[in-house]
């Protein structure tokens, strides 16, 4: 067998530093399933995002399923774990434009937005979507079209992947 010890990396919001002028970050509120977190990390790493911010975490990011599902993304992308309030203060302080994945009367199609600036994309919980903390702000809500007649939602990591890659496509 193989035994190793590693130093745990910092997961503090204040330790996030961006090398690009217009960073792209993904914010995930209260994720519960380690596999979804890992899949989001994998996609965020593949898309070359600048960070993943997890608010009000409901499981451990060090869960084996999270690390396994990330396929190494866990070790390659900066991760911050904080409260909703801390995340919101950070995004405002650093002047991010914020897009929330949300279906309501103000929601616009995700592909009609401009993600080329300093951008944060915010996803809600697997079961309930975004809390009032994110809904009650003046952020731009975006939605994915779902013309199918049976399914009205997508898996968290699938929705996140679509939104991340639209932002990446626009930045080329």
PLM features per residue range, with description:
Residues 4-6, 43-47, 61-73, 135-172:
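Structured adenosyl-cofactor binding patch, chiefly the S-adenosyl-L-methionine
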Residues 1-11:
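Short, structured interface segments
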Residues 40, 130, 163:
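Conserved sugar-transfer catalytic core signal across GT-A, GT-B, and GT-C glycosyltransferases
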Residues 11-106:
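RNA substrate-binding interface of SAM-dependent RNA methyltransferases
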Residues 99-151:
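Active-site/ligand-binding-proximal alpha/beta "capping" segment
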Residues 2, 24-26, 118-124:
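Generic beta-sheet signal
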Residues 8, 30, 125:
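Residues immediately flanking
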């Amino acid at each position: 067998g193989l035994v190793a010890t590693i130093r745990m990396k910092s997961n503090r919001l204040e330790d996030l530093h961006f090398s690009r002028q217009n960073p792209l970050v993904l914010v995930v509120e209260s994720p519960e399933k380690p596999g979804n977190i890992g899949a989001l990390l994998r996609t965020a790493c593949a898309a070359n995002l600048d960070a993943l911010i997890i608010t009000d975490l409901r499981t451990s990011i060090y869960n084996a399923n999270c690390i396994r599902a990330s396929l190494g993304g866990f070790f390659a992308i900066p991760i911050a774990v904080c409260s909703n309030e801390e995340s919101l203060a950070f995004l405002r302080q650093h002047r991010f434009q914020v897009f929330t994945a949300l279906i309501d009367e103000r929601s616009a199609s995700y592909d009609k937005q401009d993600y080329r600036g300093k951008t944060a994309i915010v996803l809600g919980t697997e079961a309930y979507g975004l809390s009032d903390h994110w809904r009650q702000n003046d952020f731009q809500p975006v939605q994915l079209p779902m013309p199918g007649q049976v399914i009205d939602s997508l898996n968290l990591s699938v929705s996140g992947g679509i939104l991340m890659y639209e932002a990446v496509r626009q930045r080329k």
